[in-house]
């Protein structure tokens, strides 16, 4: 808490200061207390998925697993009896993890997942519709290979944006293969993670953004598989 407190001698000092952290400050001479409003939103360490819903009356499949062989009653047949997330937060509210959901309103909805051992289950989002953006947080270090059940994020035809945190060390075979509508892939890792085969194939030839300081390292990295996508690699703006 002490790191979030700042003392000023005058109101002028407070007005001139830039506070971009959660802060409570006070001015000794004027006996004033200020509550700074520039506190950033804490970064979520698990998987964040943005779903865009046109028809709130339709029950959709959020992810694969936890239902019967068809994923429960939904408009998608891509369910299955795989592992459930450990926790699930729907639009800021903690909910019991379940793979089908009926949103009450149209528009964008945010669902956040955490997993046992911070491991994304195999084929977790394979063929899932309505998902437009994915953010993989710092608690997750690997994206699994595809297996007989499918790819972790394969064939998500409405997906336009993927952001992968700087903690990632391995991106598995076929991880995003078949996401034909992708517009951007952002990888924040300053050390190129090992890349599985066909991980970014069939992804609309979209740009792959990496930290500016390591663009050349990514482009020239044959041992980790990144050189295959060298023409698409650009610096994060």
Language model region names:
Residues 92-102:
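Short, solvent-exposed S/T- and G/P-enriched segments that are highly enriched in secreted/extracellular
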Residues 1-24, 32, 184-197:
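Extracellular/surface-exposed low-complexity repeats and stalk/linker segments enriched in Gly/Pro
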Residues 198-199, 216-230:
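Short, aromatic/basic amphipathic alpha-helical patches
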Residues 42-82, 117-140:
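Extracellular ectodomain segments of secreted/surface proteins
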Residues 21-44, 216-223:
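Short, surface-exposed terminal/edge motifs of secreted or surface/virion proteins that either
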Residues 90-91, 108-116, 129-142, 154-170, ...:
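Structural signature of tandem-repeat unit edges
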Residues 146-152, 172-177, 197-199:
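Consensus positions within tandem repeat domains that build extended binding/scaffold surfaces
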């Amino acid at each position: 808490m002490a790191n979030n407190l700042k003392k000023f001698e005058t109101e002028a000092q407070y007005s001139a200061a830039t506070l971009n952290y959660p802060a409570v400050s006070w001015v000794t001479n004027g006996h004033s207390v200020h509550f700074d409003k520039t506190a950033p939103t804490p970064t979520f360490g698990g998987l964040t998925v943005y779903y865009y819903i046109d028809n709130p009356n339709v029950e959709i499949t959020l992810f694969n697993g936890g239902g019967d062989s068809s994923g429960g009653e939904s408009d998608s047949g891509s369910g299955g009896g795989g592992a459930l997330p450990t926790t699930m937060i729907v639009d800021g509210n903690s909910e019991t993890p379940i793979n089908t959901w009926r949103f009450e309103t149209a528009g964008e909805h945010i669902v956040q997942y955490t997993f046992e051992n911070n491991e994304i289950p195999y084929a977790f989002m394979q063929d899932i519709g309505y998902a437009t953006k994915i953010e993989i947080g710092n608690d997750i270090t690997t994206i699994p290979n595809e297996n007989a059940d499918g790819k972790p994020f394969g064939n998500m035809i409405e997906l336009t944006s993927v952001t992968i945190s700087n903690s990632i060390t391995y991106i598995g075979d076929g991880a995003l293969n078949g996401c034909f509508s992708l517009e951007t892939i952002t990888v924040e890792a300053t050390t190129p993670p090992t890349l599985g085969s066909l991980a970014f194939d069939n992804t609309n030839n979209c740009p792959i953004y990496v930290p500016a300081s390591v663009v050349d390292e990514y482009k020239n990295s044959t041992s980790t598989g990144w050189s295959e996508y060298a023409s698409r690699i650009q610096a994060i703006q």
